[in-house]
């Protein structure tokens, strides 16, 4: 199969040796041989100096001639016609070069910068002796397209509507319908737009360079076939002279992979009807609000078995996923990256189309419908966003104009050894602006409620995952990536200024200080941070046989030492159920009963621990196998009442978490947590209070061994003289698949001092279970 690059190369004129057999054509007035050769061989960097309307000086005292030159390789005939279709001039071919030229009548309107003064009628061979006629305005009759302010903001890295400035804009220019193409490629020798409308021939539509900014532009009228739905790319002659064919960095629509072309997006905006949600989402995402996130890989959440296991599109996902997630009581859906990415096995974490939802699941408007349906169901939408690195696919950003434009030239700064990807040059204004504009595209134009920024740790440290001789210190000799810090601070500041109520979340796996501190206090400015330390410590604890847990008691307690140093989300994410790590259930020790009991206890511990919640799909019903992005979760397990019990527990945990302020209002404040028993290593028992803003407590007791414990005394605070505490949740309940050992729904308060409190309760602790009590 011939690629776009092969086709574009194949359409070049004959080699010089073959062309030398034909006599050189006579040159039209005002054109020299070198310029003609550069045009016909695709090397012309300034096409507007040759093509379109021009004034030619004549003998002294005579009126200057007005001529038109048009380049249409393969055309039989080209005419300049007036708006009524009358022939103004027959353009003569310049040999077999594809260039046509002719003189406009002296009384014709001035065509320079006024495309309506004439049109071009091009006659093409159509096979079997037939002809095809194409009529359109001349792309080279249009004046400058982008305004000075646009170019200034692009150069400064502050054009937040970049996808409405660069790229492909279906629009009217000088009252002519068509598509305005623009791309930043400051070091290219020549840039052309190629696509369905010009047979992917890079000689046909070379673009104009706006000097000083590195932006190339061209308006292609609709009469030439350019419009919404047209496939296109940019063909460049790089700084090194090599031919490159690149997808549009700011394309708002793409072909479905493995195809790699960009697609002209529909200019009509989506008609949103989620104003009520947008006005209230700030309150739904504050630190004192309940946030329970269901993490989803859109391509594998559910497969269409009747259609060969095909992934669902956005509309089908909206019908199935949204009611499922809302029915379980989650507050948010978090989508693994949906920006266009060439390799499905990257799960979206190696994107190249940072402004376009992946065409795997439908057009951009289908994604907008999905988001709106989430909002109608009172679900927030968080999208994973990847500004840390990008893949080196030849159609992408790598050496975009023949130089290291988006990345660092030095591989010690620009190459990520773990992922074989390239690292953005955060010190370059245009690159920072490109990335921030991408973030705003998702938040402003797709109404996304939050961005989870991937791999922040890899951005913050110049020596991240590198040996000592493979990194470059910063200007102070340190390991901190100061340019990345400045970028993250600027990104967060701009997002919060332009998108009220939207949140940003950092996946940051180190102890970098102030990730969620305000930028004005030298923090990074994120709203939340994934608590990777809590996740690793607690999972390691739960993986141990209960008989050994007494020796690793701090696996569950240590997280409280730093639980309020940042605003945390507790993540049981996709990263913990892949690459041989097994599923959450698979990590639990013991026989089938013990594994399920361990999982239930762990989920309840997480839901009652300070911090917002995140759970990856499949974890909510105890999937047996680890996640496979080519297959759906093991939904058949819900035929087993034990797995339905885990799912029921997640539903009830969400309901309790959302309804009880003590469990969420102070998730990020130390006043919302107090240990009662944190040192009972021998029994692996933990007891703690969660408190709302009024100080009203809930008591959580966890027994992390399979040994039931009767008569376990726990000190409790005096709450308005209450004489009993109610059992609000017990993970050993029969409805969850447990043994149904508990306290009959209530425990009495006794005037017996314990654990520093004047009063106490005696609780029956079921095996491998968590009990939640409330006055």
UniProtKB/Swiss-Prot annotation:
<keyword id="KW-0320">Glycogen biosynthesis</keyword>
<feature type="compositionally biased region" description="Low complexity">
    <location>
        <begin position="8"/>
        <end position="24"/>
    </location>
</feature>
<dbReference type="InterPro" id="IPR037439">
    <property type="entry name" value="Branching_enzy"/>
</dbReference>
<dbReference type="InterPro" id="IPR013783">
    <property type="entry name" value="Ig-like_fold"/>
</dbReference>
<dbReference type="InterPro" id="IPR044143">
    <property type="entry name" value="GlgB_N_E_set_prok"/>
</dbReference>
<dbReference type="GO" id="GO:0005978">
    <property type="term" value="P:glycogen biosynthetic process"/>
</dbReference>
<dbReference type="Pfam" id="PF00128">
    <property type="entry name" value="Alpha-amylase"/>
</dbReference>
<dbReference type="Pfam" id="PF02922">
    <property type="entry name" value="CBM_48"/>
</dbReference>
<dbReference type="Pfam" id="PF22019">
    <property type="entry name" value="GlgB_N"/>
</dbReference>
<keyword id="KW-0614">Plasmid</keyword>
<dbReference type="InterPro" id="IPR014756">
    <property type="entry name" value="Ig_E-set"/>
</dbReference>
<dbReference type="GO" id="GO:0043169">
    <property type="term" value="F:cation binding"/>
</dbReference>
<comment type="subunit">
    <text>Monomer.</text>
</comment>
<comment type="pathway">
    <text>Glycan biosynthesis; glycogen biosynthesis.</text>
</comment>
<feature type="active site" description="Proton donor">
    <location>
        <position position="507"/>
    </location>
</feature>
<feature type="region of interest" description="Disordered">
    <location>
        <begin position="1"/>
        <end position="39"/>
    </location>
</feature>
<comment type="function">
    <text>Catalyzes the formation of the alpha-1,6-glucosidic linkages in glycogen by scission of a 1,4-alpha-linked oligosaccharide from growing alpha-1,4-glucan chains and the subsequent attachment of the oligosaccharide to the alpha-1,6 position.</text>
</comment>
<dbReference type="InterPro" id="IPR004193">
    <property type="entry name" value="Glyco_hydro_13_N"/>
</dbReference>
<dbReference type="GO" id="GO:0005829">
    <property type="term" value="C:cytosol"/>
</dbReference>
<keyword id="KW-0119">Carbohydrate metabolism</keyword>
<dbReference type="InterPro" id="IPR006047">
    <property type="entry name" value="Glyco_hydro_13_cat_dom"/>
</dbReference>
<dbReference type="GO" id="GO:0003844">
    <property type="term" value="F:1,4-alpha-glucan branching enzyme activity"/>
</dbReference>
<dbReference type="InterPro" id="IPR054169">
    <property type="entry name" value="GlgB_N"/>
</dbReference>
<dbReference type="Pfam" id="PF02806">
    <property type="entry name" value="Alpha-amylase_C"/>
</dbReference>
<comment type="similarity">
    <text>Belongs to the glycosyl hydrolase 13 family. GlgB subfamily.</text>
</comment>
<dbReference type="InterPro" id="IPR017853">
    <property type="entry name" value="Glycoside_hydrolase_SF"/>
</dbReference>
<keyword id="KW-0808">Transferase</keyword>
<protein>
    <recommendedName>
        <fullName>1,4-alpha-glucan branching enzyme GlgB</fullName>
        <ecNumber>2.4.1.18</ecNumber>
    </recommendedName>
</protein>
<dbReference type="InterPro" id="IPR006407">
    <property type="entry name" value="GlgB"/>
</dbReference>
<dbReference type="InterPro" id="IPR013780">
    <property type="entry name" value="Glyco_hydro_b"/>
</dbReference>
<keyword id="KW-0321">Glycogen metabolism</keyword>
<feature type="active site" description="Nucleophile">
    <location>
        <position position="454"/>
    </location>
</feature>
<dbReference type="GO" id="GO:0004553">
    <property type="term" value="F:hydrolase activity, hydrolyzing O-glycosyl compounds"/>
</dbReference>
<dbReference type="InterPro" id="IPR006048">
    <property type="entry name" value="A-amylase/branching_C"/>
</dbReference>
<keyword id="KW-0328">Glycosyltransferase</keyword>
């Amino acid at each position: 199969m011939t690629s776009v690059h092969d086709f574009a190369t194949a359409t070049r004129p004959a080699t010089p040796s073959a062309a030398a057999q034909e006599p050189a054509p006579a040159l039209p007035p005002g054109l020299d041989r070198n310029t003609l050769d550069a045009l016909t061989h695709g090397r012309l960097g300034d096409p507007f100096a040759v093509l379109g309307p021009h004034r030619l000086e004549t003998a002294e005292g005579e009126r200057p001639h007005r001529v038109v030159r048009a380049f249409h390789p393969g055309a039989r005939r080209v005419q300049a016609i007036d708006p009524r279709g009358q022939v103004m001039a027959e353009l003569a071919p310049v040999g077999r070069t594809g260039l046509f030229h002719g003189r406009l009548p002296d009384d014709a309107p001035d065509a320079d910068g006024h495309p309506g003064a004439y049109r071009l009628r091009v006659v093409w061979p159509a096979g079997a002796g037939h002809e095809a006629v194409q009529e359109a305005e001349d792309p080279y009759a249009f004046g400058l397209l982008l305004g000075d302010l646009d170019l200034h903001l692009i150069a400064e890295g502050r054009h937040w509507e970049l996808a409405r400035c660069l790229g492909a804009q279906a629009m009217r220019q000088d009252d002519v319908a068509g598509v305005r193409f623009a791309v930043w490629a400051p070091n290219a020798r020549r840039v052309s737009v190629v696509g369905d409308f010009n047979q992917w021939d890079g000689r046909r539509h070379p673009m104009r360079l706006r000097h000083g900014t590195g932006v190339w532009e061209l308006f292609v009228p609709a009469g030439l076939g350019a419009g919404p739905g047209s496939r296109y790319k940019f063909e460049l002659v790089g700084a090194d002279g090599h031919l490159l064919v690149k997808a549009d960095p700011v394309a708002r629509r793409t072909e479905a992979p493995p195809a790699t072309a960009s697609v002209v997006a529909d200019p009509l905006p989506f008609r949103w009807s989620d104003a009520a949600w947008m006005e209230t989402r700030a309150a739904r995402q504050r630190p004192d609000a309940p946030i329970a996130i269901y993490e989803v890989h859109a391509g594998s959440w559910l497969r269409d078995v009747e259609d060969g296991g095909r992934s669902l599109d956005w509309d089908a996902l909206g019908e199935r996923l949204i009611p499922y997630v809302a029915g379980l009581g989650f507050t948010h859906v978090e989508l693994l990256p949906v920006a266009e990415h060439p390799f499905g096995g990257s799960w979206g974490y190696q994107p190249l189309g940072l402004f376009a939802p992946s065409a795997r699941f439908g057009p951009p408007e289908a994604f907008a419908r999905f988001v709106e349906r989430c909002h109608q169901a009172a679900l927030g939408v968080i999208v994973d966003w990847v500004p840390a690195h990008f893949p080196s696919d030849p159609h992408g950003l790598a050496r975009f104009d023949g130089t290291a434009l988006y990345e660092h030239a030095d591989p010690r700064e620009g190459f990520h050894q773990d992922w074989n990807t390239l690292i953005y040059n955060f010190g370059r204004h245009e690159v920072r602006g490109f990335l921030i504009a991408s973030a705003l595209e998702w938040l402003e134009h797709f109404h996304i409620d939050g961005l989870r920024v991937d791999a922040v740790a890899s951005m913050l440290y110049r020596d991240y995952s590198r040996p000592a001789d493979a990194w470059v210190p910063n200007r102070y000799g340190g390991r901190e990536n100061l340019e990345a810090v400045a970028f993250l601070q600027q990104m967060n500041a701009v997002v919060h200024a332009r998108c009220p109520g939207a949140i940003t979340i950092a996946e940051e796996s180190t102890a970098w200080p102030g990730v969620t501190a305000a930028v004005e206090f030298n923090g990074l400015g994120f709203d939340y941070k994934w608590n990777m330390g809590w996740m690793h410590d607690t999972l390691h604890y739960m993986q141990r046989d209960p008989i050994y847990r007494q020796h690793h008691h701090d696996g569950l307690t240590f997280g409280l030492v730093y639980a309020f140093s940042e605003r945390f989300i507790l993540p049981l994410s996709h990263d913990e159920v892949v690459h041989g790590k097994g599923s959450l259930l698979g990590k639990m020790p013991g026989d089938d009963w013990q594994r399920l009991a361990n999982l239930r206890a762990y989920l309840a511990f997480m839901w009652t621990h300070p911090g917002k919640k995140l759970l990856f799909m499949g974890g909510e019903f105890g999937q047996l196998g680890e996640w496979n992005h080519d297959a759906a979760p093991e939904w058949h397990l819900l035929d087993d009442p034990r797995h339905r019990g885990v799912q029921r527990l997640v539903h009830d945990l969400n309901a309790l978490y959302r309804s009880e302020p003590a469990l969420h209002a102070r998730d990020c404040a130390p006043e919302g947590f107090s240990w009662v028993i944190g040192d009972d290593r021998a029994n692996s028992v933990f007891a703690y209070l969660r408190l709302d803003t009024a100080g009203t407590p809930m008591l959580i007791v966890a027994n992390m061994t399979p040994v039931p414990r009767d008569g376990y005394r726990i000190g409790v605070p005096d709450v308005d003289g209450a004489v009993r505490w109610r059992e609000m949740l017990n993970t050993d309940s029969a409805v969850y698949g447990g043994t149904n050992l508990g306290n009959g729904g209530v425990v009495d308060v006794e005037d017996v001092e314990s654990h520093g409190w004047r009063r106490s309760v005696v609780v029956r602790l079921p095996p491998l279970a968590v009990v939640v009590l409330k006055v």
